[in-house]
């Protein structure tokens, strides 16, 4: 039955939010997007329950976890305090943020099964656990060919070499890397082409991606954040270190915030409805020049850097969106 608005307002002030993340003691406080989210949730008066992947379990068909109450502050010396731990059914939580960083491995997939059971029983899981499994960061982008550079996904060394012959300057990358690991650029005269392809494909067994090199990388690999299909109007351009062809901050890139271009907005428009449909509430697009190269759904970052440059509160906007979704269900 419909609750009166005053009751809904009271309910929204007491939400229980869970977070599945890497150990909080080892985060980089200044840059951590998950911390920004937890600070924003706490700002709303919500109580935070913390868990790592191994804390999740299922008993007699019900997903549960050992959780710890958590309070956070924006202090690089002292950013979190644990409260009591307890054992709960996941559906006692109103919302769960799945913020475990890749690798996207079997343990990650098992976690999504456990979270999916909670999602189906009424807890809002961000992002939708099924979509976390369905949307590989590199391959998902290929569903929008109008936005992408020339690319190929293949395990076949001959086909991958032919792509190099056609495009001359090519980036080869694994489909599961993070932070720019194992990304190779093969220029026209690359002597090690066969070795690069053999290594990445494990001698023709593993699918990898080949992508025409985009010279615009010198102006940065832009990270564009989207909240429920709506872009944040500023991007973080990660400028590669001198002599590097990878802009990732983890690979030594340097971040510069800037407004979205018309082409950026067009790309956002192309992908928006698919993101909403799939329950991907918080997503990071990677755009180089005019091209979409990746759609990051597992645990996109860069909130803190864009917030600082333009005095925004992106995590606050995300929490507002989550709150609206929960209010809609309560009504």
Give the label of every model feature segment.
Residues 49, 125-126, 171, 209-211:
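Structural detector of well-ordered beta-strand residues that form the stable sheet scaffold
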Residues 25-153:
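Conserved N-proximal alpha/beta basic substrate-recognition cap immediately N-terminal to
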Residues 23, 100-103, 175-177, 300:
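Short glycine-rich anion-binding loops that position phosphate/pyrophosphate groups of nucleotides
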Residues 1-12:
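N-terminal amphipathic/basic-hydrophobic helices that include classical n-h-c signal peptides
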Residues 19, 97-98, 211:
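Redox-cofactor binding/interface segments in oxidoreductases and associated redox assembly factors
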Residues 15, 21, 27-30, 242-243, ...:
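ATP-dependent carboxylate activation and anion-phosphoryl transfer catalytic cores
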Residues 42, 119, 164-165, 276:
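Anion (oxyanion) recognition and catalysis
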Residues 158, 165-169, 176-265, 275:
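Phosphate-binding site of ATP-dependent enzymes
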